[in-house]
Every structure is written in structure tokens, then in C-alpha cells.
Regions:
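Short, intrinsically disordered, charge-balanced linker/junction segments flanking boundaries
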Residues: 113-116
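N-terminal intrinsically disordered/low-complexity leader segments
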Residues: 1-6, 77
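Hydrophobic alpha-helical connector segments
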Residues: 70-102
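A generic short alpha-helical patch detector that favors 3-5-residue windows
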Residues: 7, 31, 98-102
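Short, basic, alpha-helical segments at the C-terminal edge of helix-turn-helix-like DNA-binding modules
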Residues: 60-65
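Helix-turn-helix
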Residues: 10, 14-57
Length: 116
């Protein structure tokens, strides 16, 4: 049963990253499957609603990831200034590590799909 979860998690992680880099509309499902190394059937098994469902799951995952990073930074910061500085540095480091390819994990997809 662990393989099923791994397949779903790999697919979701790949989709989340690709949506950040290419946008929701710029990412095809075959791109997600190739990046995850998953067979086509597994995507529709885990996400029967197709691209819209995996897009929502990617937004949920990105939101939870950002929320937990902010919560950890808040707990570790002795002041509001230290907290804000830490968040800004973490965002800058994420951009630099991705060679400025990763967009905001939430805004990239949310802005493209808001009117739909």
C-alpha cells in the first residue's frame, strides 16, 4: 500500500513544482507524469477530477507548506523584526536555489485559475 501513497505524493509534488515554474495552464498532465515518473493511469486513479483536482491539491499542499514555514519562523523569532527578516531571507533563498525559476507556490496557480 505504501507504493500507492508514494505515487500520489510524487505526482502531487511534481505538479506543485511544475505549476510554480510553468504556471497552471502552461503545465500539461503528461509533464506532471514525466516529472513524477508515474504511469498515466495513476494520475486519474489518485486525481479522478483531472487537472483541476490536482491543481486544487497542489494549492492546498503549497498553502500548508507556506503556513508551516511561517509558523516555525514565528515560533523561533524573538521579535517581529526578526520574524519578518527571516521570512524575507527564506523567500530569497528559495528563489536563488531555484535559479529564479520557482514562482510563488500559491499565486502562480491561483491567479491563473481565479476567473474559472
Amino acid at each position: 500500500m505504501a507504493k500507492v501513497t508514494d505515487s500520489k505524493e510524487k505526482t502531487l509534488a511534481a505538479a506543485t513544482l511544475l505549476f510554480r515554474r510553468q504556471g497552471f495552464h502552461g503545465t500539461a498532465l503528461h509533464d506532471v507524469l514525466a516529472a513524477a515518473g508515474s504511469p498515466r493511469g495513476s494520475l486519474y486513479f489518485h486525481f479522478p477530477g483531472g487537472k483541476e483536482q490536482i491543481g486544487q491539491a497542489a494549492l492546498d499542499l503549497a498553502g500548508e507548506t507556506v503556513r508551516s514555514k511561517i509558523a516555525r519562523a514565528a515560533e523561533a523569532s524573538p521579535s517581529a523584526e526578526a520574524f519578518l527578516t527571516g521570512i524575507a531571507r527564506a523567500m530569497a533563498a528559495d528563489l536563488e536555489q531555484s535559479d529564479f525559476c520557482n514562482g510563488c507556490p500559491i499565486a502562480t496557480t491561483a491567479l491563473e485559475t481565479a476567473a474559472q
